[in-house]
């Protein structure tokens, strides 16, 4: 089946795939190597992408859903966008800068393998929440198994990124 995949930078990928094939495998076969292989069960976060601005494990998304799952943009146009980690880094958005600053402040290292899960879950949390508790972050990262960062440090880094993004620099001391 011909499936058109729309990527964030308005580049499209036309592929001949079974609609049930995982988005992870289709993207990797087409050169998107920032999508890593991992548990293949949607738990580890290594294959995380942004689909319509939300973090999703690409191993659990059938590529056929990217064709039919649409949302309306601010200008009323229907769009489906997929953002890989490489695309996200190139965009250098305010969210990305805040995440990197929060991670840096908390001593989070980025090994290159599990980065997508950490960064995209942080993005989803800071972008779509007006407030964020430690429990919310713990719940969001509970299934991640980062090979280079312990869970407590990751939670602190995401909370710090949230503070920076929302201009709540002073709340760092309130958490402790």
Q: What kind of feature is each model-predicted range?
A:
Residues 1-176:
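Signature of N-terminal electron-transfer/Fe-S-associated modules in redox systems
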């Amino acid at each position: 089946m011909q499936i058109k995949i729309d990527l964030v930078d308005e580049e499209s990928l036309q592929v001949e795939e079974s609609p049930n094939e995982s988005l992870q495998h289709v993207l990797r076969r087409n050169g998107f190597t920032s999508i890593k292989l991992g548990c293949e069960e949607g738990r580890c976060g290594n294959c995380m992408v942004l689909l319509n601005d939300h973090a999703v494990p690409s191993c659990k998304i059938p590529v056929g859903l990217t064709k039919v799952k649409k949302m309306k943009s601010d200008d009323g146009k229907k769009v489906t966008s997929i953002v890989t980690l490489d695309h996200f880094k190139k965009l250098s958005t305010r969210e990305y800068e805040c995440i990197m600053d929060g991670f840096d402040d908390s001593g989070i290292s980025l090994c290159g393998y599990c980065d997508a899960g950490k960064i995209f879950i942080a993005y989803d949390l800071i972008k779509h929440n007006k407030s964020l508790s430690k429990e919310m972050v713990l719940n969001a990262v509970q299934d991640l198994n980062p090979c280079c960062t312990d869970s407590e440090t990751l939670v602190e880094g995401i909370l710090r990124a949230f503070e920076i993004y929302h201009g709540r620099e002073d709340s760092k001391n309130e958490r402790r």
